[in-house]
Amino acid sequence: MSVLSGYKIIELSGIGPGPLCGMLLADLGAEVIRIDRKKTTMPLPEPKLDITGRNKKSICLNLKNEKSRELFYKLISDADALIEGFRPGVTEKLGIGPEDCKKINPKLVYGRITGWGQDGPLSNVAGHDINYIALAGSLFSMGGKDKPSIPYNIAGDYAGGT
């Protein structure tokens, strides 16, 4: 029996910290169900080739579609937590924001992982790992004198997902 056996987590697919967080929870025994998007312009890895998909179940839903949202609501009805990494307001527009989910499952822990937080001057700006570590000053230490700073890894995303 694993530490998180019996816990059900819903993960809305994305890049970086959300999938890493879901992977770690699945590794610890939680049942993690990743909701993949049917079509996206994001450079997401093929679900079967994505290392962060390990130990997870997955389902492909178009959350802009009413029938898909009904299935989403059914999935969260007995879930313990949800992992979401979209810009502020995206899930609310889809009808699956925290208040929408609370009506279906008041005990659901709604975890949001965003680059710049839920409010503030950068909250609605898209961001990626290199943006976060540059603004934090970490990127400066990764380059040589008079050479470009090349990050060693996706440090900011990994830090956000753990």
Range-by-range predicted roles:
Residues 4-6:
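Phosphate-coordination loops involved in phosphoryl transfer and adenosine-cofactor binding
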Residues 10, 52-103:
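A structured beta-alpha segment of the ubiquitous adenosine-cofactor-binding alpha/beta core
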Residues 11, 27, 31-36:
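Short beta-strand "acidic-cap" motif of Rossmann-like dinucleotide-binding folds
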Residues 18-19:
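N-terminal Rossmann-fold NAD(P) dinucleotide-binding loop
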Residues 24, 28, 94-162:
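Active-site-adjacent "lid/gating" segments in soluble enzymes
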Residues 35-44:
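NAD(P)-binding Rossmann-fold cofactor-contacting core
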Residues 37-38, 63, 88, 115:
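Active-site loop/turn elements of alpha/beta-hydrolase fold enzymes
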Residues 46-52:
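Active-site-proximal loop->helix
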